[in-house]
């Protein structure tokens, strides 16, 4: 079964009301004639209203960068799945290394978020990946397996049906370093194989994106790899022209 690629922009802590409208207008113009690739953007939650309005009559889906576990009540500062759905959000990034590092989110906590999203009918985009020290120690596969197992051991392999995994080597995020296509493919193949131990069918369907300094210059070569099903894009998603090159490269390589 052919997997439809997904390219998603993670804006991180960037933007303004005007920037949101301007960037989405640019993306709609750039991607107007592109087919064969799903596209999503995850602006800061503050700008979901502007993004939702700007995305009207567009095939670009709306995502966000985090969610909390509680649906409502006395949880100051939290954001619920129901609130996100109110803005038409489809995809939710969880487990990003910046959340793991700066907010001390554990594999177990992230697995709970995964379950909350599945229960709400939203699509989890589960970020996994190793640090530079772990990579140099040959622990890449061990780390990725542990982060996937946190979900599989509590929710079962079927939880990955309709979900997205983003492999983001931490040493490549925002550093300008990127895994080579062969390096990335090897890890993606391992991830798919690890899930296949539980269910071949789920493994064949799950979308596995690459993230980590992916840009308009290296995207096309990465997408030639059979187990790379798209990208979770950071800095390059803040420029319509650069992001569009990545989307077009995915559409061309996978169709």
Swiss-Prot record:
Annotated GO biological process: gluconeogenesis; glyceraldehyde-3-phosphate biosynthetic process; glycerol catabolic process; glycolytic process
Compartment annotation: Cytoplasm
Keyword Translocase (UniProt): no
Entry GO MF terms: triose-phosphate isomerase activity
Pathway assignment: Carbohydrate biosynthesis; gluconeogenesis; Carbohydrate degradation; glycolysis; D-glyceraldehyde 3-phosphate from glycerone phosphate: step 1/1
GO cellular component, one term: cytosol
NCBIfam families membership: tim
Name of the molecule in the record: Triosephosphate isomerase
Originating organism: Histophilus somni (strain 2336) (Haemophilus somnus)
């Amino acid at each position: 079964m052919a997997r439809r690629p997904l390219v998603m922009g993670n804006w991180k802590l960037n933007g303004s009301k005007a920037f949101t409208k301007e960037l989405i207008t640019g993306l709609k113009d750039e991607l107007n004639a592109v087919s064969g690739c799903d596209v999503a953007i995850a602006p800061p939650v503050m700008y979901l209203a502007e993004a939702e309005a700007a995305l009207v009559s567009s095939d670009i889906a709306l995502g966000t960068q985090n969610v909390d576990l509680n649906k409502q009540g006395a949880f100051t500062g939290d954001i619920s799945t129901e609130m996100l759905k109110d803005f038409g959000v489809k995809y939710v990034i969880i487990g990003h290394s910046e959340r793991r590092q700066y907010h001390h989110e554990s594999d177990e906590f992230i697995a709970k978020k995964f379950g909350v999203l599945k229960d709400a009918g939203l699509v989890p985009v589960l970020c996994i990946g190793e640090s530079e020290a772990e990579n140099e120690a040959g622990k890449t596969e061990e780390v990725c397996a542990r982060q996937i197992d946190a979900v599989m051991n509590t929710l079962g392999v079927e939880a990955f049906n309709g979900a997205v995994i983003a492999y983001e080597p931490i040493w490549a995020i925002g550093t300008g370093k990127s895994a080579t296509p062969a390096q990335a493919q090897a890890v993606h193949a391992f991830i798919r194989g690890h899930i296949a131990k539980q269910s071949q069918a789920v493994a064949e369907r799950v979308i596995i994106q690459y993230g980590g300094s992916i840009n308009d210059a290296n995207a096309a070569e990465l997408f030639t790899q059979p187990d790379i099903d798209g990208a979770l894009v950071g800095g390059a998603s803040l420029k319509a022209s650069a992001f569009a090159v990545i989307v077009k490269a995915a559409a061309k390589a996978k169709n």
